[in-house]
UniProtKB/Swiss-Prot annotation:
Keywords: Glycosyltransferase, Lipid A biosynthesis, Lipid biosynthesis, Lipid metabolism, Transferase. InterPro entries: Glyco_trans_19. Condensation of UDP-2,3-diacylglucosamine and 2,3-diacylglucosamine-1-phosphate to form lipid A disaccharide, a precursor of lipid A, a phosphorylated glycolipid that anchors the lipopolysaccharide to the outer membrane of the cell. It comes from Pseudomonas savastanoi pv. phaseolicola (strain 1448A / Race 6). Coiled coil: none annotated. This is Lipid-A-disaccharide synthase. The gene is lpxB. It is an enzyme of class 2 (transferase). Pathway: Bacterial outer membrane biogenesis; LPS lipid A biosynthesis. Pfam families: LpxB. It catalyses: a lipid X + a UDP-2-N,3-O-bis[(3R)-3-hydroxyacyl]-alpha-D-glucosamine = a lipid A disaccharide + UDP + H(+). Belongs to the LpxB family. The keyword Lipid metabolism applies.
């Protein structure tokens, strides 16, 4: 009787927990007696993982927070590596969190354990030398986006493009009328979604700018309505403060970014993963971003890509306008977005084509790739 497969996984944040649980579910269909060890969140635990420690201990953002927790993070990683070497899983899968997981992969591969990294870090854009560490530490890279796979192929890293789970869950056609009815918005009114980011710094830099642009749009289209999904109670309080003294017809939502995107005609949006959601909902957009001047100056010299937004990176052309730093003025944002409220067909046709490329049943693709690496059958 053959020994059940043992799969080790480590996820460091909520998005990784979603990906990990989907992969675990797909693997269980193929091998019902499979065993999972490692670190995950509530979704991965619901699929049968007993997490060595709470995933939240790895969820740190920003240099100051990382430095404050560095001793703990290094100690946890050292203990995790030793535990996994002793357990000898059939494969280790690091899910995103590259600053934590890539080093684990390198040490485990040297110890003779096969390694997979799920979700590429942005090595194609900056710090490209990281690909050398990935090539040394990783038996297989699973990417969510096709241009990432092409990059790894050129660098000699074994890779499989599995598609994006969001493209699987968001339908090819979304229904604006139902979303508007749920929000109490008139069906005939033009609606713009304002999405200035999910972090305090982003909202601080972009919130007032977006509201200035919204006032200019409203002056030209008096019937215009706005929706703004707030990522957290803290962001909602921040947005409410920025709105004081303004007479904008804006509906604030707690979360519900997908509802806002389904309901709107066009989006004014911060560069980031939300632009992919807007693309999948086929909503024409203008992308804006501002950073601290020194940060922007440094990144401009480090980043190798001609584009910053995911829609343009996926299209490999300027599909959506990008207004960055000093170019992101209220006047420029309003002027660029206004025609898209009524006619964004040039963008949305491209969005539909990209959605179909990304819609590949990512969890099942990833499961098949992992089992293929192990020389196992992926028959369901």
């Amino acid at each position: 009787m053959t020994k059940p497969l043992c799969i080790a996984l480590v996820a460091g944040e909520a998005s990784g927990d979603i990906l990990g649980s989907g992969l675990m579910r797909a693997l269980k269909v193929r091998h019902p007696d499979i065993r999972f060890i490692g670190v995950g969140g509530p979704l991965m635990e619901a699929e049968g993982m007993q997490s060595y420690f709470p995933m939240e201990r790895l969820s740190v953002m920003g240099l100051v927070e990382v430095l404050g927790r560095l001793r703990e993070l290094l100690a946890r990683r050292k203990l995790l590596v030793q535990t996994l070497i002793n357990e000898k899983p059939d494969v280790f899968i690091g899910i995103d969190a590259p600053d934590f997981t890539l080093n684990i992969e390198l040490q485990l591969r040297r110890a003779g354990i096969k390694t997979v990294h799920y979700v590429s870090p942005s090595v194609w854009a900056w710090r490209q030398k990281r690909v050398l560490k990935i090539r040394e530490g990783c038996d297989l890279m699973l990417t969510l986006l096709p241009f990432e796979a092409r990059f790894y192929e050129e660098k000699g890293v074994p890779v499989r493009f599995v598609g994006h789970p969001l493209a699987d869950t968001i339908p090819l056609e979304s229904y604006r009328a139902a979303a508007r009815a749920g929000l109490g918005l008139a069906q005939e009114a033009p609606v713009v979604a304002l999405m200035p980011g999910s972090r305090g710094g982003e909202v601080g830099r972009l919130g007032g700018l977006f509201f200035d642009a919204a006032e200019l749009l409203l002056a030209q289209r008096p019937g215009l309505r706005f929706v703004l999904p707030c990522a957290s109670p803290q962001r909602r309080a921040q947005v409410e403060q920025l709105l004081q003294g303004r007479n904008l017809p804006v509906t604030l939502l707690d979360g519900q970014s997908h509802v806002a995107l389904a309901a709107c005609d066009a989006v004014l949006i911060a560069s980031g993963t939300a632009t992919l959601e807007a693309l999948l909902y086929k909503r024409p957009m203008v992308v804006a971003y501002r950073l601290a001047p020194l940060t922007f100056w440094i990144l401009k010299r480090m980043v190798k890509s001609p584009y910053v937004s995911l829609p343009n990176l996926l299209a490999q052309r300027l599909l959506v306008p990008e207004l960055l730093q000093d170019d992101a003025t209220p006047e420029a944002l309003a002027r660029t977005l206004l025609p898209l409220i009524d006619d964004g067909q040039a963008q949305t046709a491209g969005f539909d084509a990209i959605h179909r490329i990304l819609r590949r049943d990512a969890s099942n693709q990833a499961a098949d790739a992992v089992l293929s690496l192990l020389g196992q059958s992926s028959s369901q």
